[in-house]
Amino acid sequence: MAATNIPKYNGAITAGALLVSESRHIARLLLNQSSSGDWHQAIVVDNVLQKRSPASAKSQAKLIKARLSLMTPELWKMVESGSADVTTQAVLAAAIKHSRLLADFMDTVIRQHWQTFVPKLSTRDWTDYLKSCAQLDPHVNQWSDATRAKLKQIVYLILSQAGYIDGTRTLKLLPVSVIPEIRAYLIDNNETDVLRCMEITQ
């Protein structure tokens, strides 16, 4: 019975969008098997993420670490030293696995737009999507309007940064090809659900 009370969706993603450049630093710390002291030195003292406050830096570091920790060191290496495109898609893959809210939006809403030849998202898409999420997870009904708006902002920004839409204002859908290196990694590591989300435009 307790398992049914576990939220299917959560708002952890509000801490930041893709955070590509920041993810390079976190991947490096993970690859180096850094101690808690090393993390504090890098994130708080040295401010490698270049945030305005220690609280913001720690919040984003926590989010990125949670994302990347779901993947293997092989992906961390792509994040840390890959090209801009490779790093972006590697970070996106981790973000999709970390956030069911992002994953399902891509796999259902955006996929349907491509299948029905609707070339752009609408403001109503997010509202309707959250209603469908609430049917699967009643916890969604407890989210405030501010939280819903922030989640929309972050998800749309992620889609823009990853090249799936041309901007957060126009919301025009763009075709995306998954880089072979990323695709091979996802297949080899049985991340087919993540790959399915990333291949929605194909």
Model-found features: residue ranges?
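Eukaryotic partner-binding/assembly regions in large regulatory complexes
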Residues: 1-89
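Leucine-rich, amphipathic alpha-helical/linker segments
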Residues: 12-16, 26-29, 33, 85, ...
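Short, leucine-enriched amphipathic alpha-helices that occur as contiguous helical runs
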Residues: 23, 102-103, 123, 152
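Short capping segments at the starts of secondary-structure elements
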Residues: 33-35, 118-121
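Positively charged, polyanion-binding regions of nucleic-acid-associated proteins
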Residues: 89-93, 97-120
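Long, low-complexity intrinsically disordered regions
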Residues: 110, 114, 134-143
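DNA-recognition alpha helix
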Residues: 122-136
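Accessory, usually C-terminal, subdomains that scaffold auxiliary metal cofactors
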Residues: 141-202
